[in-house]
Amino acid sequence: METASYKGAHMNLDYIKGVNLGNWLVLEKWMNPALFDGTTADDEYYLPTQLDPAVYEARIKTHRAEYINERDFATIKSWGLNSVRIPVPYFIFGDRAPFIGCIDELDKAFNWAEKYGLTILIDLHT
């Protein structure tokens, strides 16, 4: 019996060889405890309840701008990988106060992935 394999619309992938970009758009305290400094919050859900709104916003925006960037996508490609997994939160569009959406960062990731010939696996991770 022969089985068919899926080939991406723009890429010829026989195997997914990738890396997880966790803690970028969905915070994981165990991966970067510094984001939770000054709080007793254990996860992103409780973090904004324990920080001044301006501090929370600045911390999140700085983290998202610096934690993963285009250089990382170039490096991933140079390692011979062809895919990245990006966990995203349910508030990706920014419609759930006090959380800050991250659709702009995901859009950048798609542009970088296209530039470096990578595919993206989006994982709703909430």
Regions found by a protein language model. Give the residues of each.
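N-terminal carbohydrate-binding accessory modules
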Residues: 1-81
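Substrate-binding cleft and catalytic face of glycoside hydrolase catalytic domains
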Residues: 70-126
